[in-house]
Amino acid sequence: MFGFGPSYDSYKLKVQLKLAVSRIQILKNKKANIVRDEKRNVAELLRKKNEESARIRVETIIRDEYLIECFQIIEVLCELLHARINLINATTEMPLEMKESIFTLVYSSQRIQIPELEQIKNQLKAKYGKGLENEANCHCSTHVNPKIVHKLSYATPDPSIIFQTLSEIAEKFNVDWCGSDYPPPPQLIMPQPIIVQQQPQILQPPPQIIHHQQQPQILQPPPQIIQQQQQPQMPSFPIMSPPQQPTFSQIQHQQQIQQQYQQQQQSPQFPSAPPSFYNNNSGNQTPQFPTISTNNSDGYSNDKFNNGNNNYNNNNNNNNNNNNNNNHNNNNNNNNNIPPPYQPSSDTGYPDYDELTARFEALKRSNDF
């Protein structure tokens, strides 16, 4: 890094912090001895009634005591900065928890003549920029320790503090001194009471408080919740579509069915008589029976057996002729009892069920069911 000022060196900063602590301890002890000697000299001046000289020297004692207190604060801040040197090295910007410590050291280095504090200020300026010193002076009331700002100021001490310090020195060294000419400290000055002439107060009757009678609160019933009764749902009817007109092929098929139905009505089929046991067209075949072996020893001959068979066949033929005649007569009677063919009474050509029922009853009576 090329620049006009010194570069930041953490090791050098750490060494300067340790040296600053040692130097501050030496200066603190040295200033404490000087203050003790100065107080003895001021006590001798008070014993000789040389109060003006004592008052001037007391101001020096007060500044030295302030400086000792500042040394104690700076010593603690240097130890804190030495302990958190790694935090300073790890961050590029100034940590918030270290801001007051850094600004206080930079601010005090301008007012206390310590070489180590000057080196610490240069290292911090190399780390955080050259404007650090100017920023510390501008924001001394916010970022700098307020005790350091107050005790390192160039203003003269307050007269009350001077009077208090002289009183402490005279008491410590057993000097008979009465500081009547010096003003007391501000906490000892008693304010004079202010006498105010009070005018006689006219007694007025107290205002009448009118109590309004509270009307009894009438409890109102809660609002009724009107539940809407669910109306019964009407059954939904199927959507009736208009009847489809029959096609030409359907009309022809319907006419054919009507014609077949009329033909069946004109020639009704009736139950026929059960067929005869023997068919006449078969040539009067006689049933075959198993032949029985006969011997002359039984007293029966084959001629007698054949004669018996012929007589049986003749009787069967006569019975068959009689049955055929009866069937022919029954057929003639049935033809006479057949009702006339059905003629549809409706214009549409469809059968009337009442007429069909009547015809069916007549047919049952004719067949004796």
Curated annotation (Swiss-Prot):
The keyword Electron transport does not apply. GO terms for biological process: protein localization; protein transport. This is IST1-like protein. InterPro entries: Ist1, IST1-like. Residues 277-305 have a biased composition (Polar residues). The lineage of its organism: Eukaryota, Amoebozoa, Evosea, Eumycetozoa, Dictyostelia. Keywords: Coiled coil. Residues 12-59 form a coiled coil. Residues 225-239, 246-270, 306-337 have a biased composition (Low complexity). It comes from the Eukaryota. Belongs to the IST1 family. Residues 224-354 are annotated as: Disordered. It holds the Pfam family Ist1.
